[in-house]
Amino acid sequence: MMKNLLTVALAFVTTFAFAQTFVSTTPENKNVVLEEFTGIYCGFCPDGHVIGQGLHDANPNDVFLINIHTGGYANPNGPSDPDFNTIFGAAIGNASGLAGYPAGTVNRATFSGISPQGSPGTTALSRGDWAAASAIILGQSSYVNLGAQASYDMSTGILTVNTETYYTSTTTNINNLHVAVVENNVPGPQSGAQNYNPGAIISGPWNPTYNHQHMLRHLMDGAMGIEYSVTTAGTFVPNTHTWNMPANLSTGQSTNGYFPDLDPTNMDVVAFIAEGPGEIITGVQAEVVCIFPNAYDANVTASS
């Protein structure tokens, strides 16, 4: 049984001198969280993967990717196909108002002059608009900074993520902290790979076999995340999140294919602050560092 263990240590501190450890306390601009909706049988989706990766590569400390496999194109065709769906993907996709694949939300925001795929006021954008939307977000100031560090204990099977939130100015909006677990270097089939992303083709049992990246595997605090009740300037909030990682994601899902084993050695976490179920204000990514028995390893830390 998948077990999500959450330990929340909330300490609201108006002065950070003795508490803050790795989050920045200097006012900064927003970072981009691109949630890309994709699927193994979406022929144009590899082009979306290329665009998203290009945005990250051009802004490695400011643009973070979450690839969400959901919808009909993500469904396996038979028992030899991996199922990359999660229990969270459909709801996130439906909330975006997406009308085709690939689609993506840039901070779950709406943009003047950029039309969404669906009805007005929805957030899913066609891939040709991701760069322009990202540039707008990167130019906006953020009222909150976020830091994260992550480690996985190979002997206990527990992923631990420490986050720190610091408010550089006051907001009256509801804030929710989310921690997404993403997996890289996941082999599987992919339509359109030869045409749009041949560099991601690897050896393997599918024709072609594709190296999937940034694949959503879990939301450590559920779909709603952790709500913050104090969001005034100078507030510092540390949290510890834990997940007893299962072998695969079969719990709570059925499939026509199979659920591949999870690989903690190829994982990152993307933490982000959103205004309730709405716009993401900023985010940060941290590599998951695996700690082996009798080995000592420092966490990789990221902050914004």
Predicted regions and their residues:
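N-terminal capping/interface segment
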Residues: 4-7, 32, 98
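Local sequence-structure signature of Cys/Sec-based thiol-disulfide redox active-site neighborhoods
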Residues: 22-71
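Bacterial Sec-dependent N-terminal signal peptides
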Residues: 1-26, 296-299, 303
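Proline-enriched interdomain boundary motifs that mark the N-terminal boundary
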Residues: 31-34, 143-148, 293-303
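Short, conserved sequence motifs used for protein processing/export or organelle targeting and
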Residues: 50, 61-294
